[in-house]
Amino acid sequence: MKRWYVVHAYSGFEKSVAQALRDRISRIEIQDRFGDVLVPAEEVVEMRSGQKRRSEHKFFPGYVLIQIETYYEGGVPRIDNECWHLVKETPKVMGFIGGTADRPLPISSDEADVILRRVQDGAEKPRPKVLFEPGQMVRVIDGPFNDFDGLVEEVNYEKNRLRVAVLIFGRPTPVDLDFGQVQKS
């Protein structure tokens, strides 16, 4: 049975470590003992210079998840030496997280499911980089109310929209705006 293990990699090199692991696994032809290699991340949307930009936000910077064939020895999960050495000797890998240096332990199935669900949700619906709350002051940076300040009244994360009370002629007027049209003031 394959279980998920957490590998500590140099921060900023998670993707290259994941690719190096995939390459090494296929070069040695032991794909049957490995499953997915994953850098848990989600897509976030932010406004920069008036443009909507999509970027990636890693859930666990400096860590890579890898599925490895696991057997049980005295009720304790173990991986074979060849798999251990393949991961441990990959450039920019510092080691496994959990267990001991030479006997890593997998994360629980529940933890793995939560992480995989978050990755799936992030891929299906990019979330805004900045989160808003009712009662918070914001500045409109795009559209007909550009440069107006307002107070957040409602937040709709499903549609990435806000209802903001903007002062127009000295009166608060509710205006519906996209997350990308405002910034925290």
From Swiss-Prot:
Listed SUPFAM superfamilies: N-utilization substance G protein NusG, N-terminal domain, Translation proteins SH3-like domain
Entry-linked CDD domains: KOW_NusG (cd06091), NGN_Bact_1 (cd09891)
Keywords of the record: Transcription, Transcription antitermination, Transcription regulation, Transcription termination
Keyword check for Transcription: yes
Residue ranges occupied by any KOW domain in the UniProt entry: 134-162
Alphabetical list of InterPro entries matching this protein: KOW, NGN, NGN-like_dom, NGN_dom_sf, NusG-like, Rib_uL2_dom2, Transcrpt_antiterm_NusG, Transcrpt_antiterm_NusG_bac_CS
Annotated function: Participates in transcription elongation, termination and antitermination.
Similarity section: Belongs to the NusG family.
Name of this protein: Transcription termination/antitermination protein NusG
